[in-house]
Regions:
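Conserved class I S-adenosyl-L-methionine
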Residues: 1-7
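Conserved SAM-binding loop of SAM-dependent methyltransferases across substrates and taxa
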Residues: 8-21
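Short glycine-dipeptide loop
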Residues: 21-22, 100-105
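S-adenosyl-L-methionine
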Residues: 28-75
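Short strand-turn motif at the edge of the Rossmann-like AdoMet-binding core
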Residues: 30, 70-71, 109-112, 135-136
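Glycine/threonine-rich flexible loop motifs
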Residues: 74-85
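A short glycine-rich, Lys/Arg-flanked "PGG" loop and its adjoining helix->strand segment in the class I
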Residues: 86-102
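Class I S-adenosyl-L-methionine
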Residues: 112-152
């Protein structure tokens, strides 16, 4: 299990509690998180060139589940913020292409906002069984939703 943008660590705690006991769990974020037993946390930027190698060094096999709840710091400009989240999701997709095993799952935050058309086409090339989920806790007017899909 790999969590990109893992701070503050909530999804890692859920993965540890509900994931298979044999799962290796790794979280990566720019920010340091509190230690969680049996979870590897790496303080790193996902845009660093060596990120895929670092991920591969932490797993003996490809990853079965890649999670990402990343969101950029808000600039106050909805268009800029939307482009930033698209950039994050594109990077998550690039990483998933190399580290996610066939039939592995990707769960990623995505924001609706108009500029995601090209991104959706890229997603359809790499992934299948694409579903969208809006948590009940998310405000109705919020563009936040989640993408759940399987790697081809």
């Amino acid at each position: 299990i790999l969590d990109l943008g893992c701070a503050p660590g909530g999804w890692l705690q859920v993965a540890k509690k509900f994931g298979p006991k044999s799962s290796r769990i790794v979280g990566i974020d720019l920010l340091k998180i509190e230690k969680i037993d049996d979870v590897v946390s790496i303080e790193k930027d996902i845009f660093d060139e060596d990120i895929k190698e670092i991920i591969q060094k932490n797993f003996t096999n490809k990853v079965g589940l890649l999670m990402s709840d990343m969101s950029p710091n808000s600039s106050g400009n909805k268009k800029i913020d939307h482009l930033r989240i698209i950039s994050l999701i594109e990077r998550v997709l690039e990483i998933a292409k190399d580290v996610l095993k066939p039939n592995g799952f990707l769960v990623s935050k995505i924001f609706q906002g108009g500029a995601q058309g090209d991104l959706i086409e890229k997603i359809k090339i790499e992934l299948r069984d694409i579903k969208y989920f809006k948590p009940k806790a998310s405000r109705k007017q919020s563009p936040e939703t989640y993408l759940i899909a399987k790697k081809n």
